[in-house]
């Protein structure tokens, strides 16, 4: 997966609970073909998608990988935007079912490749292990919810010190300069994804996806999001109003509150937020949020802000450690399914399926 430059998450272990945008990675317009895989852990869903992605890349088809936020080494989805094809894992916690079965979506049932009798001796262990995995994810979610309160507190503190009018005027000038207006344009299409999130490894960010998607990137350096959120929100509205298709990359911790980045493919242009968790190795222009924020006023809350940042870091660490324990439990659960699978049949199916879809 290291050879693929474009990686996104379609789900996030956020401070608001698990947040899924799986249903926003395609349009039910009669042109997209969506294959939803159903099956248990360890049944080859990720390997199937990796095989498909590799073959698509061999044919020089633009291929987007969507790793799993609970295990970034595994895939949750593969998107071929130019061919309008999606393959995704439709199992919990990001359960996806067809809305337009046959016309748009089709289920790939991987239970067809396992031996039901192989589970007979392990039913109790499978249920207990599944429940333990769910309990650990709930514990991680509570750590994230607590962190969310502290992140929000710092955001509101910084927002109270931010000159909103000055920030908005800057955003307007920036958009007029970089985004050509279109007359009588229909609203553009928006694709919603993530490039970061909390995982068993800690916070992971695919910042390279943004810079690989655009020739020009405007980076807003803002640890609290008070100014960057105003700018990014305005960019989003302006681009959509002028008929540009955009990729909106939400904040993985508070997705209902923040949009972190906007990519406008038609213009080869991106606007990105740089903070404690997402860094860009780029010489691109940087806008520093402090020019819009009263540092004197913000300084009055420095102790609270410092405490919140330190406590958030500890809560994220605890959440990651808990997710790591959950992954170990999930790996054990996979073992029960692996020994029940007929991978030879699945491999043959993967080869035929891939040939049929790509040729």
PLM feature segments, named:
Residues 21-32, 40:
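Charged, compositionally biased non-catalytic regions
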Residues 37-38, 48-49, 56, 64-67, ...:
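A cross-family "folded-core" feature that marks the main globular domain of proteins
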Residues 2-19, 54-118, 124-125, 236-317:
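Conserved nucleotide-sensing/catalytic segment adjacent to the nucleotide-binding pocket
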Residues 125-177, 307, 311-353:
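An accessory alpha-helical subdomain
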Residues 34-53, 200-239:
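Glycine-rich phosphate-binding P-loop
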Residues 1-26, 165, 169-209:
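N-terminal pre-Walker A segment at the start of P-loop NTPase domains
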Residues 1, 48, 149:
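A detector of single, family-specific signature residues
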């Amino acid at each position: 997966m290291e050879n693929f430059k474009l990686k996104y998450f379609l789900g996030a272990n956020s401070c608001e609970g698990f947040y899924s945008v799986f249903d926003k990675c395609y349009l039910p317009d009669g042109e997209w073909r969506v294959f939803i895989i159903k099956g248990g852990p360890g049944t080859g869903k990720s390997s199937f998608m990796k095989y498909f992605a590799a073959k698509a890349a061999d044919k020089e088809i633009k291929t987007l990988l969507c790793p799993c936020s609970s295990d970034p080494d595994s895939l949750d989805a593969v998107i071929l935007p130019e061919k309008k094809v999606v393959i995704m894992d439709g199992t919990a916690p990001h359960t996806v079912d067809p809305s337009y079965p046959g016309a748009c979506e089709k289920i790939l049932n991987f239970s067809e490749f396992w031996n039901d009798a192989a589970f007979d001796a392990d039913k109790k262990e499978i249920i207990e292990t599944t429940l333990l995995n769910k309990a650990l994810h709930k514990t991680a979610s509570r750590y994230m919810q607590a962190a969310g309160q502290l992140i929000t507190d710092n955001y509101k503190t910084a927002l109270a010190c931010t000159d909103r009018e000055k920030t908005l005027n800057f955003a307007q000038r920036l958009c007029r300069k970089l985004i050509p207006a279109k007359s009588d344009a229909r609203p553009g299409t928006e694709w919603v994804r993530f490039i970061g999130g909390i995982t068993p490894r800690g916070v992971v960010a695919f910042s390279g996806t943004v810079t690989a998607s655009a020739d020009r990137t405007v980076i807003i350096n803002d640890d609290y999001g008070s100014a960057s959120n105003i700018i990014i929100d305005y960019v989003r509205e302006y681009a959509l109003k002028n008929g540009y298709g955009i990729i909106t990359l939400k904040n993985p911790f508070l997705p209902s509150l923040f949009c972190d980045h906007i990519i406008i493919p038609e213009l080869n242009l991106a606007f990105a937020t740089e903070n404690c968790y997402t860094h860009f190795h780029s010489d691109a222009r940087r806008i520093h949020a402090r020019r819009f924020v009263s540092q004197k006023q913000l300084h009055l809350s420095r102790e609270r802000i410092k405490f919140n940042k330190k406590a958030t870091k500890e809560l994220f660490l605890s959440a990651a450690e808990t997710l790591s324990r959950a992954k170990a439990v999930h790996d054990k659960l996979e073992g029960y399914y692996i020994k029940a699978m007929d991978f030879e049949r699945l491999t043959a199916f993967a080869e035929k399926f891939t040939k049929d879809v790509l040729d």
